[in-house]
């Protein structure tokens, strides 16, 4: 899930590969989303060379958003940043035909143990803990209602 294409030892034995990726959050998070996108494409180009037609599924991706936090220009933890991150990530997914699945982390915010990396829990949900939609929920509704049923016919 976290190996890179040139270091993964098990991927050649698998029928498909699954990855957890957070370019723009844990990797190159903040003001440099363009840098995160370029780094993500670089990794994906590497996967294109080693997958030989096998599908790739993203089993985790996302960014935290404190519900109700709005900032312009966008900053990490804001609704605007979460949407910009998701749009960038989806653009990378859509660029590669071998990407055949995506599972956002997470459906809804949830409580975690105390710590400096989480503000009263994990806030990567597209819904709040009370199951109210964040701005990202509307982005996903648009994406999921417009994705083609046959991924081989999607546009790049």
What are these regions (language model features)?
Residues 1-156:
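Substrate-binding clefts and catalytic carboxylate motifs of secreted carbohydrate-active enzymes
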